[in-house]
Regions:
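Hydrophobic, aromatic-enriched alpha-helical segments typical of multi-pass transmembrane helices
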Residues: 1-251
């Protein structure tokens, strides 16, 4: 593979972060009726009624969310390429980031599958539907550390970039670290069925998903800019040679 081809793939991988954010918000958030999610304080019959009322939308949304969750993988891969370039021969932060990213992708795909199971049979026992819904949200949230280590490792690597043109502005790296640490309140989420720390609350849902999406978007923007710049430079290097070859063939 040529350097130019590799850089094209890197640019595409960086842009997968934007596609993930948009598509996951549409499928899991809008179609899955998770903007915000149903209250954890709902009774089993009320939750079963909610799932039955929105049966097709919830099933479709979560099936599609399980699919588009894979977009986290190429975005993570490109972030690891950038970090490895920064770290050099001992890329411990890169390894932490790529493992955290792989596990995050698993959660982004596996948890919607659980909600799809909950929606699969509208006539199922309401207690089973509620248990599956609980499993999905608790698993989705309290495994936050896999994403925290990814964000923190990326932020630390960004701050360690001593090149003349760092890939990430310092505020982006600090925001990544802040994002990873901001998930800590989720540890208390299972103890609350109402209020800001419930899974549909102001902190646990709106606040933390907000920091997460800003982190993904900001790092994605600068990764795409970096790949575009390197691709442009690679094209400029080869342009004179390609011109000479074209002139030689025309003679």
């Amino acid at each position: 593979m040529t350097a130019k081809q590799s850089l094209k793939y890197q640019l595409l991988a960086a842009q997968c972060g934007f596609a993930f954010e948009i598509l996951y918000a549409i499928f899991w958030g809008y179609f899955g009726h998770n903007l915000p999610p149903a209250s954890p304080n709902l009774s089993a019959p009320d939750l079963a009624s909610f799932f039955a009322q929105h049966h097709n939308a919830i099933l479709f949304g979560n099936c599609m969310a399980a699919l588009v969750g894979i977009l986290w993988v190429p975005w993570t891969a490109q972030l690891s390429v950038v970090m490895w370039r920064i770290e050099g021969s001992s890329p411990v932060l890169t390894i932490i980031e790529v493992i955290g990213g792989a596990l995050t992708a698993w959660a982004l795909m596996f948890c919607p599958a659980i909600w799809a199971v909950a929606a699969f049979r509208p006539d199922a026992d309401p207690n089973i539907i509620r248990t599956l819904n609980d499993l999905g949200f608790i698993l989705f949230n309290i495994t936050y550390a896999i994403t925290s280590v990814q964000a923190i490792a990326a932020g630390l690597a960004g701050l360690a970039d001593k090149g003349s043109s760092p890939v990430f502005p310092r505020w982006v790296s600090y925001w990544a670290i802040f994002t990873g640490l901001s998930f800590l309140p989720i540890t208390a989420m299972p103890f609350f069925k109402t209020g800001p720390l419930a899974w549909n609350g102001a902190i646990t849902f709106w606040g933390l998903f907000g920091t997460y999406f800003v982190w993904t978007a900001s790092m994605g923007v600068y990764m795409a800019k970096d790949a575009s710049r390197r691709l442009r430079e690679e094209s400029e290097v080869h342009a004179p040679r390609q011109l000479k070859e074209a002139l030689a063939r025309s003679r």
